[in-house]
From Swiss-Prot:
Keyword Zinc-finger annotated: no
One of the GO biological process terms: DNA replication
EC number(s) per entry: 6.5.1.2
List of catalytic residues: K124
Gene name of this polypeptide: ligB
NCBIfam families membership: PRK08097.1
GO molecular function per UniProt: DNA ligase (NAD+) activity
Biological role stated in the UniProt entry: Catalyzes the formation of phosphodiester linkages between 5'-phosphoryl and 3'-hydroxyl groups in double-stranded DNA using NAD as a coenzyme and as the energy source for the reaction.
Taxonomic source organism: Escherichia coli O7:K1 (strain IAI39 / ExPEC)
Key words of the record: DNA damage, DNA repair, DNA replication, Ligase, NAD
Protein name: DNA ligase B
Family from the record: Belongs to the NAD-dependent DNA ligase family. LigB subfamily.
InterPro entries registered for this protein in UniProt: DNA_ligase_AS, DNA_ligase_B, DNA_ligase_CS, DNAligase_adenylation, DNAligase_N, NA-bd_OB-fold, NAD_dep_DNA_ligaseB, NAD_DNA_ligase_OB
Length: 560
């Protein structure tokens, strides 16, 4: 009873999280958005099931289908079954296809496994489900999954797939098998290669007329033998003897969720002969086939892999001004998980790049992780019906603006503070963008070094700065006074690399001010253009004012 209560609680929590991200739309807007996405998915369904082609990646289709279902639940519309084909299949399945319930995570799987025994794990092969009917030792009929009760007659197509045994014997002579027609792969590593749109490719080959030779690129993985032998080992042995060898090779006994996780991770990284999108855990003991119904299989569940890319909704478009004055665009997202990382923001790049992407709040974008786990945009997969894009700030900033605070300089000013506090500059541990914003909002800095004048009492009374942290922060600010001269010059934004600055051997502000363009040009990695930038920088009125202020604070190297 406790287990079922835990499962019920987890379901309710999942539903609550789904409702928490319902769009704030009027009924009319909701109807329009749902209708547009519904029409698009119907078109994709028609292309997939009637013509055997796909205009969208499998993963994108699945996630947008889930998004549609979520919207329908949010606004009280009827839900649709994801991946539901047109109900025009005329051939009855001898045994219904049940489908498989998805587990949200390892904990949910553990709860499910706790009350069951004699459990086995198989790869969730990514292809198209099929029923194989053998009568008197011969392949009598092959039926597409359809709606689980009826499907299309695929017998002639399947007979052309050389990997499917056309004759069997023994217990299989009069049997019904269920499995997955898949695209044969040589050494497919799911972690590296992803789904390659395998499901759509298989559907395309099965739905198209002619091209019988290409069907030999397909094979079948049998995952169910309704009313077969009681023992799983006997089932696997008979299937292997008949030619369905993959089932025995890739079916393993498991006792708990830890063992499933181990196998799941192994298959995620291993070279396999097919594309997968997770694992299926099934109990060897199954009800009689006459009790099988779509959506009612309690003896098996799936634990899918986390998608390599996730569809995320854009909440807002934000503009950031860097320390050099460049404007960059960031998309704020409804959070998604990618490889155990919560992604809430993704950098779009320049204003021009954003305009080329044509991204607005409400759009659905495909996000993945690039090198070092940095989120990136792969595609815009759906654009909302109502699209209002914000106006970017005027391009009035450059590398010599916003050393002093003003309303128009807010973002670049904060960027300069974040830069000077970084490890490679003044090394102010324990303060980032949020902390600088809190300090500036409360104490209204005049310029980028005004924080040097803050007292322990002021820091302690700053909203957003914990009292326990304020003493540590004051200590960090005091330690900064002992940083070398070159670190302070870097904090002022001198347009030189650290290597070039160190090579200059400049040790005082007065010495730096008298250095010529020719002197700077001789430094490693510093050409004539960069040397002119240094001259412009040191002659800038704001820079000179900051130098004088640091001298008054008796910062090393700035004293007269």
């Amino acid at each position: 009873m406790k287990v079922w209560m835990a499962i019920l609680i987890s379901i309710l929590c999942w539903q609550s999280s789904a409702w928490a991200v319902c769009p704030a739309w009027s009924p009319a807007r909701a109807q329009e958005e749902i209708s547009r996405l519904q029409q698009q998915i119907k078109q994709w369904d028609d292309d997939y099931w009637k013509e055997g082609k796909s205009e969208v990646e499998d993963g994108v289709y699945d996630q947008l289908s889930a998004r549609l279902t979520q919207w329908q639940r949010c606004f009280g519309n009827e839900t649709r079954d994801a991946m539901m084909p047109p109900l025009n299949g005329a051939v009855m399945h001898p045994v219904a296809h049940t489908g498989v319930r998805k587990m949200a995570d390892k904990n949910a799987l553990s709860l499910w496994m706790r009350e069951r025994s004699d459990l086995w794990v198989q790869p969730k092969v990514d292809g198209v489900a099929v029923t194989l009917v053998y009568r008197d030792g011969k392949l009598n009929k092959a039926i597409s999954r359809g709606n689980g009760l009826k499907g299309e007659d695929w017998t002639q197509k399947v007979r052309l797939i050389s990997a499917v045994p056309q004759t069997v014997s023994g217990p299989l002579a009069n049997s019904t098998l269920q499995g997955e027609i898949f695209l044969k792969r040589k050494g497919h590593i799911q972690q590296q290669m992803g789904g390659i749109n395998a499901r759509a490719k298989v559907a395309g080959l099965m739905m198209r007329q002619g091209n019988s030779d290409t069907l030999n690129s397909l094979a079948v993985f049998v995952w169910a033998w309704p009313d077969g032998p009681q023992l799983m080992t006997d089932r696997l042995k008979e299937l292997a003897t008949a030619g369905f060898t993959l089932t025995q090779t890739y079916t393993r006994a498991v006792k708990n969720a830890d063992e499933v996780a181990h196998v799941r991770n192994e298959w995620w990284k291993a070279k396999l002969p097919f594309v997968t999108d997770g694992v299926v855990v099934r109990a060897a003991k199954e009800p009689e086939s006459r009790h099988w119904l779509p959506g009612q299989a309690e003896w098996l569940v799936a634990w899918k892999y986390q998608p390599v890319a996730q569809v995320a909704e854009v909440k807002a478009i934000q503009f950031a001004v860097g320390k050099s004055g460049k404007i960059s665009v960031v998309a704020s997202l409804v959070p998604v998980m990618l490889d155990d990382k919560k992604v809430q923001r993704v950098n779009i790049g320049s204003v021009r790049h954003w305009q080329e992407w044509d991204i607005a709040p409400g759009d659905q974008i495909l996000v993945s992780l690039a090198g070092q786990g940095i989120p990136r945009i792969d595609d815009v997969v759906w654009r909302g019906a109502e699209r209002t894009k914000p106006t970017p700030p005027e391009n009035r900033f450059n590398s010599l603006t916003c050393y002093f605070a003003s309303d128009v300089c807010q973002e670049q000013f904060i960027s300069r503070l974040v830069w000077l506090g970084s490890k490679q500059v003044l090394g102010l541990d324990g303060i980032g963008e949020a902390g600088w914003r809190a300090l500036h909002q409360t104490h209204r800095f005049e310029h980028i070094f005004s924080w040097l004048l803050l007292t322990p009492e002021q820091l302690q009374n700053t909203p957003g700065i914990a009292k326990s942290k304020s003493a540590q922060l004051w200590h960090q600010f005091n330690l900064a006074r002992q940083q070398p001269f070159t670190r302070w010059v870097m904090a002022m934004g001198i347009p030189l690399t650290r290597a070039a600055l160190n090579a200059s051997d400049e040790r005082s502000w007065s010495q730096l001010l008298f250095s010529t363009e020719q002197f700077w040009q001789q430094l490693p990695g510093t050409g004539s253009g960069r040397a002119r930038q240094v001259i412009e920088w040191k002659e800038n009125a704001q820079i000179k004012k900051l130098g004088s202020w640091l001298a008054a604070q008796q910062i090393t190297g700035f004293e007269p």
